[in-house]
């Protein structure tokens, strides 16, 4: 089975449940991931922090109904490209084999705006 995100600012991972919650309301493993990425690829908080988006990207976005603020999500693109947008999971006797504690998680790194997201699940084989 393949679980895939259509969005270049999102990722799909397998991870276990952390059980404990951080003070931000995220599970502690999720918060740890946020903290690591914040150090490694800081959230874009000001124009010019990253080379992207350039003028041509902003013009393209405007032609497609996007606002300039929403284009300043380079951190989300970089984070997604490192983690990946899909996972492959073995199906054994009709059950996803994620190990004893594994779960599938969808991560939306784009903090510039809320929007509807799509995840595709495809079962391949028998």
Task: Label each PLM-derived region with a short phrase.
Residues 1-126:
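Active-site histidine-anchored catalytic micro-motif
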